[in-house]
């Protein structure tokens, strides 16, 4: 305690100090906390004031390029996390923070980088309690204005933001080290920020989340977003001697998260590699109402009000009101607006306001296919794309703003014209069919150009009677003749959805409501604190790694199981006391069973908590391993069905039938078009080659597009990773039958089919074919179907690429549409959650059952989902067991959706799935 004192001034500094011997150290594994209190008493000994806070004791060091905590080299498995709530935006209540921390701990994360600002104080208080390392970040992100980090007039602002953070947060033990900010340039003000921070807290180190490989002032370097090889080459064996922490890596926008094992193999190999923070934790969706407006055309195309777009009264009519910000009408990419005609009419009534001169996107389908938009203060542009982009501009009338005008744009196959208030104002020559591109029709926005980096007012206007026609019209616009007709007389609410605004990246490892995305199971597996590997199969010896830094493996109950396929045939418990960061050879007392031909054998190990923790109950699984055992006997040859099914051959079709089945092949197109089992039709569309899947969110982003660019790229398909796939035309295959023959052997009926799948629907011009010297790009398929008397179909499929190919195919396989009644799914493979070839070790092999609808994953932006890998067998059946069974001569992957791939490709929002 301090000696008695008197205060004559408003402030007085009193220094108190004591020696704390051998305190229990705070770590994420052992969040030991102490209460620090301060009492003020008067000379009579009566307490006049008292304050308390929670503190912890820890020490960080860097020795020989390695980061140490309490004398132990530390690996940091982190998530980046915004303060994000689907209802409250950036307001985080305590219950939500606790839920986040429970999920992080349950899925084996030990840290959070608070991107890109200090969190609310409660966040740090709870991190102290739960045991999570915090990389606390100065809120100085400049991003598009990074150059200010070099301007001396901004120095004090950088320093001031640093001071506020460090002075508030430095007594929280959870703060592992500081970050000088995010993407705020590489200038001297970053150095000043770190100088300021170190003057206030000399006990902690600093990193900086810049876009350079490193900053000279930081103690801990990046890089961010390296590949596993780049991480290894640039840092693992690099020359910079500072520890490395990837402040951002593995962008999990939408369906993503591949190669995580590869990163952590490199991290464990090199002591200097501390780990990294995945980008990022909480999906950014905000709850919005689904507000539909009626399309009065015969097609009733789904169209929805976005943002705060409003319907307002204007005289006797109701009109669309847009204020120039993120407000527009989203129209689904239905076939009726995916126009490729040689005629087009766009028409609408417009009441432009002042800000419309900033952009004025009235009716657009991307930046190329077709559109009507204002250019500056005095021009109106109409554009289409046939052999190239054609456009015509008309001068605006002097009374353009704050008056209603009728605008009509017409293309008649020879000429493009703009009409304003019934008078032709401009025209130009153009010809050819309009080319279709993968962007939706928007009213009041351009979906291709107005995304998260929009810097203009996109449409400040009121609009009414918006029409699109696949014919040339200058008057007499009848909704029943339109491809789209919106009169905005009413809106209908149909629930809610998670909005990502005008084009935010749909990052996230958990959904906005805190339910877990499938990638999290891989993250949990890769980051698990125990790992197992087989050392001696014969003796049953397994090597255990305890990757905990401070806790013994004795905190876990460990159970082993010997499985025959999915059946447990032996099991037992293990008592382990492996020290932290140590290995141990463990004997598993299994007995080799009598092997059954065709069965697989594997050893499963499960580690669960023995006691309740703040973040999970006893019994929570923290680690598991699946060790394949090299015990197998080949299947005995199956007794083949005797006899040959009957078949009939007509000019148009081949019918193969037997007891309880009938299959039909169309001889014209060479496809299997019907499968009837027990009088039930199973097929809705033919079996055919599949090279396409709906693009993933990362593939629809321009962020990494340059790495996927090739000579395939064509104008109009955007600037994204998916541009390569769209430009090659693999989403637009044209089926071309080449030959069809039938024969009969003792095996059954043999159907030999050769066909071609041409990429791009013949979109090449003659001059392109001449210059490139390639007549067609596509795949030649050789199919042999062998159908036996039991109705089993053996398919032998060989495909041969011809011509110019894309850099990669998003998928190579077969696809078919089956009856909705076949909604019961059972498979032997990895599961139960969605998994992909580069994200599959976190999903154990087993026999799983689900339904088609239950396998849906609600990514904020619809995309491919639901793959299951390493599949040995698959069944699709009705609830009565009627259906299809699939097997291959090797393990395979499958998806099954209640939606078409075309729907998944074209939908931009979950409410557009149908």
Feature locations, PLM:
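Beta-strand/loop-rich accessory regions of lumenal/periplasmic or secreted enzymes
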Residues: 27, 589-598, 613, 627-914
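Active-site-adjacent substrate/metal-binding segments within catalytic domains
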Residues: 23-25, 37-188, 245, 695, ...
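Substrate-binding clefts and catalytic carboxylate motifs of secreted carbohydrate-active enzymes
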Residues: 178, 235-320, 490-583, 587-589, ...
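A short beta-turn/strand-edge loop motif at beta-sheet boundaries
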Residues: 356, 549-556, 804-808
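Extracellular glycan-associated modules
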Residues: 292-492
């Amino acid at each position: 305690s301090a000696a008695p004192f008197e205060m004559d001034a408003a402030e007085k500094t009193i220094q108190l100090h004591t020696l704390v011997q051998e305190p229990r150290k705070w770590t994420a594994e052992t969040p030991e906390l102490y209460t620090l209190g301060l009492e003020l008493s008067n000379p009579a000994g009566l307490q006049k004031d008292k304050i308390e806070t929670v503190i912890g004791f820890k020490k960080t060091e860097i020795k020989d390029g390695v980061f140490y905590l309490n004398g132990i080299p530390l690996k940091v498995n982190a998530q980046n996390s915004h303060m994000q709530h689907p209802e409250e935006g950036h307001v985080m209540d305590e219950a939500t923070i606790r839920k986040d921390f429970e999920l992080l701990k349950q899925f084996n994360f030990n840290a959070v980088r608070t991107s890109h600002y200090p969190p609310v104080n409660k966040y740090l208080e709870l991190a102290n309690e739960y045991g999570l390392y915090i990389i606390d970040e100065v809120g100085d992100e400049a991003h598009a204005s990074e150059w200010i980090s070099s301007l001396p007039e901004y120095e004090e602002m950088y320093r001031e933001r640093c001071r506020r953070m460090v002075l508030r947060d430095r007594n929280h033990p959870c703060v592992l080290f500081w970050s000088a900010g995010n993407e705020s340039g590489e200038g001297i003000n970053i150095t000043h920020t770190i100088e300021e921070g170190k003057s206030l807290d000399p006990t902690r180190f600093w990193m900086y989340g810049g876009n350079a490989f490193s900053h000279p002032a930081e103690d801990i370097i990046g890089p961010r977003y390296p590949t596993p090889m780049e991480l290894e080459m640039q840092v693992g064996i690099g020359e910079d001697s500072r520890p490395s922490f990837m402040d951002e890596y593995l962008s999990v926008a939408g369906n993503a998260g591949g190669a995580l094992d590869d990163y952590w193999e490199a991290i464990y190999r090199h002591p200097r590699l501390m780990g990294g923070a995945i980008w990022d934790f909480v999906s950014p969706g905000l709850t919005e109402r689904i507000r539909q407006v009626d399309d009065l055309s015969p097609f009733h195309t789904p169209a929805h009000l976005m943002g705060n777009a409003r319907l307002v009264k204007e005289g006797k009519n109701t009109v669309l009101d847009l204020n120039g910000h993120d407000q527009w009408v989203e129209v689904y990419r239905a076939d009726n607006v995916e126009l490729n005609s040689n005629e087009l009419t766009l028409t609408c009534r417009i009441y432009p306001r002042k800000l419309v001169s900033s952009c004025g996107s009235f009716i657009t389908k991307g930046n190329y296919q077709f559109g009507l938009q204002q250019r500056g203060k005095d021009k109106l542009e109409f554009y289409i794309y046939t052999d190239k982009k054609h456009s015509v501009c008309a001068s605006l009338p002097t009374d353009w703003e704050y008056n209603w005008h009728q605008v009509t744009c017409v293309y008649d196959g020879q000429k493009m014209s703009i009409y304003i208030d019934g008078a032709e104002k401009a025209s130009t020559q153009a010809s050819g069919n309009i080319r279709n591109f993968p962007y939706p029709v928007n009213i009041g926005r351009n979906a291709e150009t107005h995304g998260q980096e929009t810097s203009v007012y996109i449409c400040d206007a009121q609009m009414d009677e918006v029409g699109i026609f696949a014919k040339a019209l200058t008057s007499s616009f009848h909704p029943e003749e339109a491809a789209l007709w919106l009169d905005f007389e009413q809106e209908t609410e149909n629930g809610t959805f998670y909005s990502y605004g005008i084009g935010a990246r749909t990052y996230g490892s958990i959904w906005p409501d805190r339910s877990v995305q499938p990638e999290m199971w891989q993250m949990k597996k890769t980051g698990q604190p125990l790992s197992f590997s087989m050392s001696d199969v014969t003796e049953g010896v397994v090597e255990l790694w305890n990757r905990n830094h401070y806790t013994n493996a004795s905190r876990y109950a460990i159970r082993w199981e010997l499985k025959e396929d999915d059946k447990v045939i032996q099991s037992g418990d293990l008592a382990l006391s492996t020290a932290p960061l140590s290995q141990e050879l463990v004997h598993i007392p299994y007995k080799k069973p009598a092997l059954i031909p065709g069965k697989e054998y594997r050893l499963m190990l499960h580690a669960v908590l023995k006691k309740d923790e703040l973040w999970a109950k006893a019994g929570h699984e923290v680690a598991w391993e699946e060790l394949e055992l090299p015990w197998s006997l080949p299947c005995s040859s199956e007794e083949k069905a005797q006899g040959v099914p009957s078949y009939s051959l007509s000019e148009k079709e081949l019918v193969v039938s037997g007891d309880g089945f009938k299959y039909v092949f169309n001889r014209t197109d060479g496809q299997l078009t019907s499968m009837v089992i027990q009088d039930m039709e199973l097929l809705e569309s033919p079996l055919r080659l599949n090279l396409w899947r709906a693009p993933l969110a990362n593939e629809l982003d321009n962020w990494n597009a340059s790495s996927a660019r090739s000579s395939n790229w064509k104008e109009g398909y955007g600037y994204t990773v998916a541009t390569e796939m769209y430009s090659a035309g693999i989403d637009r295959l044209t089926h071309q039958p080449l030959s069809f023959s039938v024969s009969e052997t003792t095996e059954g009926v043999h159907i030999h089919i050769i066909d071609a799948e041409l990429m791009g629907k013949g979109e090449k011009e003659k001059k392109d074919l001449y210059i490139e010297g390639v007549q067609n790009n596509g795949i030649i398929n050789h199919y042999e179907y062998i159908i036996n008397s039991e109705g089993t179909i053996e398919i032998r499929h060989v495909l041969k690429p011809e011509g110019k190919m894309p850099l990669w195919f998003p998928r190579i396989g077969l696809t078919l549409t089956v009856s909705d009644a076949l909604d019961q799914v059972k498979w032997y493979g990895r599961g139960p959650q969605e998994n992909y070839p580069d994200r599959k070790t976190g999903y154990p092999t087993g026999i799983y059952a689900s339904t088609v609808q239950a396998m849906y994953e609600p990514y904020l932006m619809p995309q491919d989902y639901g793959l299951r890998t390493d599949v040995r067998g698959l069944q699709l059946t009705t609830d009565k067991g009627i259906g299809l069974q699939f097997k291959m001569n090797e393990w395979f992957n499958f998806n099954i959706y209640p939606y078409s791939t075309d729907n998944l490709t074209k939908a931009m929002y979950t409410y557009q799935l149908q």
